[in-house]
């Protein structure tokens, strides 16, 4: 089949994490801030020890697991402490939101590709709502014609 325009099929796909934005740095900073507040409010470990336990939990459960701080208090205290869990979760999310920024060249690159007639998409490993949250918070969601996550296709 002949194509009318060879440019009709020009597509560029991006990942979200560590491609459009630096998730590794903001996640580490947010986790350390959460641990600091949890320790300051009664988690009986020093900050480095507590962060080490949290990193072990994240390695075991995966970064998309939603109850890292619950498990942390269970491991350290022998039971879940809702106040400490809430402090950890709220601090993590507040710091994450404050630091969530696209890489410096992201917006210019997306604008350029769109201006050149490229269709843009996202293929990303993660929970669909979390990936969309990042795209919306970064205000880049409107650049993308398609967003596909591992959760949607049943992959891990």
What do the PLM-derived regions correspond to, one by one?
Residues 45, 56-91:
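A metal-dependent, Asp-based hydrolase signature
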Residues 39, 74-75, 114, 136:
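Short polybasic/polar patches that bind polyanions
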Residues 2-49:
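Active-site neighborhood of HAD-like aspartate-dependent phosphohydrolases
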Residues 30-38, 54, 69, 73, ...:
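Hydrophobic alpha-helical core bundles mediating ligand binding, dimerization, or RNAP-core interactions
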Residues 99-101, 127-156:
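Substrate-recognition "cap/lid" segment bordering the active-site pocket of phosphatases
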Residues 8, 66-67, 75, 81, ...:
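Short, acidic loop-to-helix structural element flanking the phosphoryl-transfer center
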Residues 124:
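Conserved phosphate-coupling serine/threonine residues in phosphotransfer and NTP-handling enzymes
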Residues 17-20, 117, 139:
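Conserved functional loop/turn residues at catalytic and ligand-binding sites
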């Amino acid at each position: 089949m002949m194509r009318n325009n060879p440019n009709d099929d020009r597509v560029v796909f991006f990942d979200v994490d560590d491609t459009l934005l630096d998730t590794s740095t903001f996640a580490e900073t947010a986790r350390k801030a959460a641990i600091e507040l949890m320790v300051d409010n009664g988690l009986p470990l020093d900050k480095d020890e507590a962060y080490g336990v949290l990193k072990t939990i994240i390695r075991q459960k995966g970064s998309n697991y939603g109850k890292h701080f619950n498990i942390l208090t269970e491991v350290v205290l022998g039971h879940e402490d809702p106040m400490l869990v809430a402090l950890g979760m709220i601090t993590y999310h507040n710091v994450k939101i404050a630091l969530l920024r696209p890489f410096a060249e992201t917006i210019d690159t997306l604008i350029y590709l769109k201006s050149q007639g490229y269709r843009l998409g996202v293929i990303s490993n993660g929970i669909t709502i979390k990936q969309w949250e990042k795209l919306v918070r970064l205000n880049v969601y409107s650049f993308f014609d398609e967003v596909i996550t591992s959760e949607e296709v049943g992959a891990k």
